[in-house]
Amino acid sequence: EAIKKSKRLKSKIISIGITNQRETTILWDKNTGKPVYNAIVWQDRRTSKICENLKKRKLENLFRHKTGLFIDPYFSATKVKWILDNVSISKKLLKNKQLMFGTIDTFLIWRLTNKKHHFTDATNASRTMMYNINSNKWDDEILKKLNISKSILPKVKNSADDFGTTSKKIIGEAIPINAVLGDQQAAAVGQACFDKGSVKSTYGTGAFAIINTGNKKILSKNKLLTTICYRLKNKNTYALEGSIFIAGAGVQWLRDKIKLIDNAQETEKISKSIIDND
């Protein structure tokens, strides 16, 4: 659609970059390319009980120090586990080595390259709660705790890397895919947050603040997430992130469910009419 709207020749497109919802999870059949279940989006809280069980097993410190994340339904790991536990076809495909996992970037790469490449980048991997941000590998100990097979996981690459070439069968032209970043990290790069201490805040469905911490991984004492901002030439640049799940989604709720407003723009006038909201 973007190519058609731009009215540009496909042959003049030098390369493609992908940015995506980070934690949203898909498992699919390697042979057919069809998902075994609907994508479970980042806001979905259905895996709360799985997370509580992990906490009861006193695994919070393990996950925190290895992945930089807290045990929470937000991240991909327990979504993967839920599908494996509740969708019968996934077990059969896993047994036959036909099951694949990916966040949205991985699924897009798989489809755009016509099933040739099963890749992700470090920023997306760092949001799965299965990736060790110290060793830069899928973590065997964590996978064992979750009973998730490494065989379904994609290869993790630099954020700027060779992710394959689009298939002519898919979009009519062979175009290199040379960059992949999770959406919030892509926003940080877009705002030129390349220096240690530089910060961006994005307001959309949720609100997300990211601060570049350079080559140093910092574990926050204030419930911030430790994540990978980007990886270039096999070197991580780390970040701290504050995530608020409901921002613009709250405005949507006021408009569509409560019917308090007719359009989102009205919220600005209402906010400005209040002298003090303490």
Please report, for each region that a protein language model flagged, where it lies by residue:
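Short, conserved phosphate-binding/catalytic loop or strand-edge motifs used
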Residues: 23, 77-78, 125-126, 160
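Glycine-rich phosphate-binding loop of ATP-grasp-fold ATP-dependent ligases
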Residues: 36-37, 70, 123-130
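Carbohydrate-associated surface elements
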Residues: 44
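Active-site core segments that coordinate phosphate-bearing ligands/cofactors
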Residues: 48, 55-69, 73-118, 129-140, ...
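A structural motif corresponding to the C-terminal end of an alpha-helix
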Residues: 145-152
